[in-house]
Amino acid sequence: IKMLVYILVIVAVFIILTFINKHKLDKILLMASTMIYGSAAIIQDNKFYFSIGACIIMGAVTVYCVGDWLRFKLKKLPTIAIIAILGILFTLFTGLLTSFKYLQHWAPCYDFGIFSQMFNYMKETLQPLTTCERDGLLSHFAVHFSPIYYLLLPFFFIFPSPVTLLMGQAAIIASGLIPLYLICKRHKLSNAAVILFSLCYVLLPSMANGCFFFLHENKFLTPLILWLAFALEKNKWIPSVIFTLLLLAVKEDAPVYAAVLGLYFIVSRRNISKGALVFVLSIIYFITVSYFMSKYGLGTMSYRYDNFIYDGSGSLFTVIKAVILNPIYTVHE
């Protein structure tokens, strides 16, 4: 009986669509059904390679369905408005859901309890102190050097609640749409293409998923990397220095991202002088922070890279050496 009902429904839909006979409607239904079926399949079986294959198929069908539609021209203001709406929706969706999880007491002490306590100490003393991180009063910077957190402090002064941190984190990620838009326009992409890139940005699972582990300094990385890339592309000294310093302030290992970006602009000869500046600043910052954390803090947690530290030295420079000398092993790991 179920099969008979299924066949009758298919026949009825086919007859209705035959009378409508709209070319775009066919493609809309094809794209929608493929996306729904593909998403349901990934939910049922979320193995990595199966998910990649399903995404490729859904992407190919989407390109086939909307390829001709991308030829229409959008003006600047509607494009900016659409991107702004995407950013607001991302902030509300991610910020509110993570806030609801916190308000339902689903937030763990590690790491959200640590950061909530740290911001309360920063509000009262301007020092990033915690007592629950290592069973005693100490500066969080002894564990991870992340002065970038002070950018959130003014908002925490006004609204002293952990919810402020979660909403602020979502807004920070959404702010990456601004440099993404500027980079796309610099490369003379169409407004329709810019919107698609922006849509990919907000729908990329890693953008929102990390927020559901609550607050973390790494959420600053993406927008700051994009801002630094844009500053280097524009060949501006002051913005390049400012965004380099902001990126370095995210964490003790953030110089790796800045150094790689600087190295890219050197090797590609797109901006050798400023790429060299970013690279040198990153190396100096990394050495300085690593030294002070080893001497006055709890070290740089290099044990996380033990699979790359082949000589047992515990040095992160060995990691860099291993990556250069054995790139195949790097890909394997």
Description of each model-found segment:
Residues M3-L97, N271-V278:
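Start-transfer (signal-anchor) and selected internal transmembrane alpha helices
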